[in-house]
Amino acid sequence: VRLDDVFSRHRPTAVIHLAGYIEVGESVNQPERYLHNNAAKSDILIEASLRHGVEALVFSSTCAVYGLPQTDLLAETHRIAPISPYAESKARVERALAAAAARGLRSAALRYFNAAGADAEGAIGEAHHPETHLLPLAADAVLGLGPAITLLGTDYPTPDGSCIRDFVHVSDLADAHLRALDWLQRAPQRGIHQAFNLGSGAGYSVRQAIAETARIAGHAVPHTVGPRRPGDSPKLVGDISKARHELGWTPKRDLAVQIEDTLRWRRKMPR
């Protein structure tokens, strides 16, 4: 199905662009694949949106566009310096959206930190094949549904040697998308582009997240130690004050809730 046909049939006034490959390590081994799928194909979507009079576009970007942090708390004004093809692909889309503002498109790039959690009822959640995300891997390990989790690097310049990440619940992310869309549609001017950090504003190390999983599950998480994963930053924690102020967004579900929801989902998940 051609994009032009879809736009002509449904005549959308707004687009929420969530699609794309997301694995940092895989992108290092397959850079052309990531740049083609994530960046080049997004260019096609942006051009189609402009041709068909779309007024607003919300894009799922990533905190990985910042690269190696220059400050403890990353604000949207931090330099953009991707260190993986995945991050570069997202940065390219952000640049394309910024350029499209000159042609009248309103857009928001939502820079996710570490998306986590699942539906509170356990009806839906992430199910990658193979799974690469920390919380579902830790959940499977502690529930006996998967192998021991491997800590990818324990020699980072952090207090316990493991990476520090800012985890944000997927339900809070969903709320942010709706708020961003509403913000764009209410904007008085045509042709704007803004980026917003979406995180919790607090950092937890990989070791801390594993320990919290063990506490909630009631017993230790089997784990081993492995080498660093190419393209990983030692610490990524977001300053979310802009999203709070501009979008009226506040994350409501902390790491414990994210882990509880992940455990519930992994128990129920079809395999």
For the regions a language model picked out, list residue spans one by one:
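Conserved Rossmann-fold cofactor-binding substructure of NAD(P)-dependent oxidoreductases
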Residues: 1-14
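Conserved Rossmann-fold NAD(P)-dependent oxidoreductase catalytic core, especially the SDR/UDP-sugar
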Residues: 17, 43-85, 99-108
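Short alpha-helix in the Rossmann-fold core of NAD(P)-dependent oxidoreductases
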Residues: 20, 30, 35-42, 58-61, ...
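Active-site Tyr-X1-5-Lys
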Residues: 68, 81-118, 136-146
